[in-house]
Amino acid sequence: MEETKATEQTESIKEAKISESIPLDELKPGQLRIIKRNGKVVLFDVSKIEVAITKAFLAVYSSTAAASSSVHQKVDELSKKVETTFRNRMPSGGTIHIEEVQDQVELELMRSDERKVAREYILYREARAQVRKEELLDSQEEVKEEPLKGVARINKVATEACEGLDGTNPDQIVTEAEKNLYEGAPEEEIKQAMILASRALVEKEPNYTFATARILLDSLRYEALNFLDLDKDALQEDMKDLYPKALSSFITKGIELKLLNPKLAEMDLEKLGKEIMPERDNLFTYLGLQTLYDRYFIHSDEVRFELPQVFFMRVSMGLALNEENKEEKAIEFYKLLSSFDYMSSTPTLFNSGTLHSQLSSCYLTTVPDDLYGIYGAMRDNAMLSKWAGGLGNDWTPVRGMGAHIKGTNGRSQGVVPFLKVVNDTAVAVNQGGKRKGAVCAYLETWHLDIEEFLELRKNTGDDRRRTHDMNTANWIPDLFMERVMNKETWTLFSPNEAKDLHDLTGNEFKEQYEKYEEEAKKGNIKAYKEVDAEELWRKIISMLFETGHPWLTFKDACNLRSPQQHTGVIHSSNLCTEITLNTSQDEIAVCNLGSVNLKNHLDKDNNLDKEKLQKTISTAIRMLDNVIDINYYAVPQAENSNFKHRPIGLGIMGFQDILQIKKIPYSSDEAVELADDSMETVSYFAIEASSDLAKERGSYSSYEGSLWSQGIFPIDSISILKEHRTEGFLDQNEEKKMDWDTPVSYTHLTLPTISRV
């Protein structure tokens, strides 16, 4: 009996969709309400309990009980006890399920020694429960007897989805999907049921992730082809003929809707359409394709009309707009992207070929120490984030809390109040409407506000001095680490009184920093604070453990090994700390990124296929260089910097996949050797490809004076770092020269993500 009641109650709760609105007077505070079995919510009515108990008495004592005053009194007494129980339990009102009320009636009947009446009441409830159960089974049988609309196509989609995938069963997908369908179900619900049924099987068999992706692809085809006035019921086997038409129709529609660059229509769409490879749709995992659907595909009023291979061709066409042989290069780029051998950065995938082709990943800015500059930097953040750029802000120049303000003769509130505004700006201005805005604030370790800065991501404290949506990073000079190791004191300064520290590195920084310490002791510097270096380091590490912030970045290593140190100073890294570029009032540094998928570059013996890797990197470097010329620049300082220095960043992904394939533990010496070998190979081919491109396009404008022009490779610049560090700190010496030009100032990096399509 208890099991039956529990089942009924569970079913009722599942069906609890309040289909009828409740009158306002029934929503007053203190009201008791009842959830009926059909899900409807009504006011608690004690008279209904009186009727039910009276019927139970009549069943035992016959109709004479109806005229008995003692029975009426007993019914009234029992009903009030039931009501009082719930009033005491919920004095402020609340909602009770009908089963709970009936349980309480049973209990009160038993307590009052009316056992015969209680027994009759229980039997009545069981009889009603059995009737409801039979009615439910009958309704289910009726549904099963009627065939589902389009069942033949459902079976065909499932069969196509599982083709060639070991361990998958199309019948199982269809069976699970049919459990959630009904006669007359809309097309969208049928497709969604198929996706959910297949997705639920992924944990049992990983290959279902590919099957689910193919089912999702069928749903996408229906949506896109219908919008493009093509055969919306097409299956994957039909796409060889349909993809060229879809490309042409997509370009035409996109230009009409003012979403795509009209220059795309000037290319030979027929030639490009013939090169599309529909079979590469089957390379997607479910998560990869769903991510593209949610964020990347071009849409009109939330209707996606861009198919996966059209998407890759659109990106490739956008990157080839300035090429002499546009179609040939677009095809070359398409083959690389659609194979997943190489993947462009998210902004490039978002915006290539569109009217605002903002293709760069991250922007680095330095914030000046005045209100116009501070709020100007925030405006730049908003404009850059609008077109999907990530942001890295250097806040070290802004004076610390308590520092004197000459203009107002007041005291500064420091950087933290401004960072709160930056945090909220990043939330308010998302990245092209496709993902949240993202920013990282950098502060050098000697800044007077560093201790408060470390606590910005804490969940406790004054929320006006917290930035829950913004990343933070600590820009650490080597001298601080020396003080930590030697257990010495560390002095914090306000940058308005230690003006040049932020622009100095290595031995020059150390010399000037110690001079400022002497000036502070003499009383010539007002805003400063001495702290224990080790204690500050402990706080940094504690906050990193507690909040994941601040990230640790090292100023001297970044600057002393920079190929571009002749043109300025690196004041910070970017949003994801993977690239370090010069910034100033006239230059907002720009990251132009992409990554090679190492997993796709293994030979039959599972070793790196270096010949294929060389070809991939050669094409990738060209694509990245094209980004610089095609890119839409929301602010002029970014354009100035990007054209002057032309930095690109080629990273890798798939390293963990290789370790799995080769059965190498991540923490082993073998893994370290593989990492060293793979990155050395990528580095060499990236520099070689850059040099080859320079022969065609010439070197970048600030090339002369760079470490490249001096024949110093990035790996060789470690000797420069050695000169500025304590004796014996590093013991490495390499002899190697480079006599090539290069069209870009930076070529490769460590990417911040392992996400993959």
List the predicted regions and their residue ranges.
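N-terminal glycine-/lysine-enriched basic segments
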Residues: 143, 180, 633-649, 676
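Function-dense linear segments that define catalytic or interfacial modules
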Residues: 298, 311, 315-330, 334-358, ...
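Conserved small/polar residues in nucleotide/adenosyl-binding loops
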Residues: 747-753
